[in-house]
Amino acid sequence: MDQGGGASPVFSASAEIDGDHLRVLVTGEVDMATADVMFQTALREPAERVTLDLRAVTFFDSAAIHAVVRLAQHLPGALTVLPSRQVHRVLDISGLADQAWLRPA
């Protein structure tokens, strides 16, 4: 259902490495069709620090939550998640708002 009159948000996940820091920029809808791409993109390059930038994400479902939790398990102490308001709300409802890897929206 199109409520805004425009095209639906297109998913993308891109990674850029700067020294020991990997920044993964995710945009659009993260769902069961795209969550694994986000996960694999975040693990593509070895890095001591990984920032998962979700500030341009417009939809985030249970598959996306699962992918982020798996990333936190794969990258203990190295993951930082920058959420959009929608993503933060979903993670809050899911009981994950107090995780050390999650920054405020």
Residues covered by each model-derived region:
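STAS-like cytosolic regulatory interaction modules
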Residues: 1-63, 67-105
